[in-house]
From Swiss-Prot:
Domain Radical SAM core: 161-393
Gene name for this UniProt entry: miaB
Name of protein: tRNA-2-methylthio-N(6)-dimethylallyladenosine synthase
Domain MTTase N-terminal: 15-134
Keyword RNA-binding attributed: no
SMART domains listed in its UniProt record: Elp3
Length: 458
């Protein structure tokens, strides 16, 4: 009998993973890094859940009904699994902040789930998956002793190239501020800062894969601190000066910041570094000192306004975005008017605004004098009308200007490309320029939350 020729055996098809990501930019980063770590087990990313062998739901716990949204997704996945044939099994995992908060309750309510992994454990995902293949149900929500970032594999260059020329890089995680409305200290843990060496190496990997713009991430990113090779303590401003020297990198950003940690070295970086884009997301949440105190924000509105002025003096072309919560317990009409007053003074380019919703486990959830939903709705509508007016005014203010735009991807129409302005907003332009190039574009009009540009005569 002839022996089979191994060369004629078709290679095994790669396993596919689909990750549904909710929430912040850090969750996007986490999903990308989970995909990279799973490549060691033969997984490749897919954009459609129907052909996936593994589906992960990477969750966010910031807003109300986050858990309910998860269980709705899991209900649909239960039907999908039932429809699978025996030769196409489906594994289901839940990751992220709802996983951290709910833990084993997820397995109780949704037996379809094979594993539950908190944000500090996703570096163990490949090994935990192997355990589920033995029929085990896994709940891994403890805070790992080891540095999870040190155990992640290098970036997959092919995957990075597919994602585009802009990338996220987590430099700090967790929060020690304990704002009374926020679950982050409970789901992400205490503040940790990655080392300068780790950050530099990951930035180099991204640049080698074609990335031109890096956004440094952290729940409290300007709380980052580390040591340089000489043992000197660095803050975020020092790190930005350091990364700005990397060959091939064209742009830097960072988010999200706390007003308390905006120090002089960071403001100086905005003044000195052209590579640092003139855009800053600086949440304030309320303009009322009484509400800021109740939120444990640890600053007053005047301090925030003075900080805005100081940063604008350092970088006159900077655009600010913010976060606002209306209807925090005890908020009066007068408190809300203080918020409106602050918004008018700052003049934001964009902002995120929400109705307060009590998050289990936070101090805010135990407070009295909750605001009626109808009042919250009215205040939110009022606030959003003002913010939209400011956003449109900012867009119009750039008409007629020429600005450098990073070309990111093809547009909807033939010959059209979409780029990123220095102020983060997209720019649509007819051009043959390649992705990754930075070119001067004349802003001739605006669209919904974006600019319409044209090539200049260089």
């Amino acid at each position: 009998m002839n022996k089979a020729n191994p060369k004629n055996i078709p290679p095994l098809a790669p396993k596919k993973v689909f990750i549904k990501t909710y929430g912040c930019q850090m969750n996007v980063y986490d999903s990308q890094r989970m995909t990279d770590s799973l490549s060691s087990k033969g997984y490749v990313a897919t954009q459609t859940p129907n052909d996936a062998d593994l589906i992960l739901v990477n969750t966010c716990h910031i807003r109300e009904k986050a858990a309910e949204k998860l269980y709705s997704d899991l209900g649909r996945l239960r039907v999908m699994r039932q429809e699978r044939t025996p030769d196409k099994p489906l594994m289901v995992g839940v990751t992220g902040c709802v996983a951290q908060a709910e833990g084993s309750e997820i397995l109780r309510r949704a037996p379809i789930v094979d594993l539950v992994i908190g944000p500090q454990m996703y570096h163990r995902l490949p090994d935990l998956l192997e355990q589920t293949k033995q029929g085990k149900k896994i709940v891994a929500t403890e805070y790992a002793v080891e540095d999870k970032f040190a155990h992640l594999p290098p970036h997959n260059k092919r995957a990075v190239r597919k994602r585009g020329v802009s990338a996220f890089l987590t430099v700090q995680e967790g929060c020690d501020k304990f704002c009374t409305f926020c679950v982050v200290p409970y789901t992400r843990g205490a503040e940790i800062s990655r080392s300068v060496e780790q950050i530099t190496e990951e930035a180099r990997q991204l640049i080698e894969a074609g990335v031109k713009e890096i956004t440094l991430l952290g729940q409290n990113v300007n709380g980052w601190h580390g040591q340089n090779v000489n043992g000197k303590t660095w803050r975020l401003g020092d790190l930005l000066y350091h990364l700005a020297k990397l060959d091939g990198l064209k742009r830097l950003r960072y988010t999200t910041s706390h007003p308390r940690d905006m120090d002089d070295s960071l403001i100086a970086a905005h003044r000195d570094l052209d590579i640092l884009m003139p855009y800053l997301h600086l949440p304030v949440q309320s303009g009322s000192d009484r509400i800021l105190k109740a939120m444990n924000r640890q600053h007053k509105s005047i301090h925030y306004l003075q900080l805005i002025e100081k940063i604008r003096n350092a970088r006159p072309d900077i655009a600010f975005s913010g976060d606002f919560i209306v209807g925090f317990p005890g908020e009066t009409d007068e408190d809300f008017e203080e918020t409106i007053k602050l918004i008018k003074q700052v003049e934001y380019s964009s902002a995120y605004s929400f109705k307060y919703s009590p998050r289990p486990g936070t101090v805010g959830a135990t407070m009295k004098n909750h605001v009626e939903e109808a009042v919250k709705d009215a205040r939110l509508q009022h606030l959003q009308v003002l913010l939209l007016e400011q956003q449109n005014a900012f867009l119009r203010s750039k008409i007629g200007q020429t600005t450098d735009v990073l070309i990111e991807k093809a547009g909807r129409h033939s010959g059209q490309m979409v780029g990123r302005s220095p102020w983060l907003l997209p720019v649509v332009v007819d051009t043959q320029a390649s992705t990754g190039t930075v070119i001067p574009i004349h802003i001739k009009n605006t669209s919904s939350n974006s600019f319409v540009g044209e090539m200049t005569n260089m």
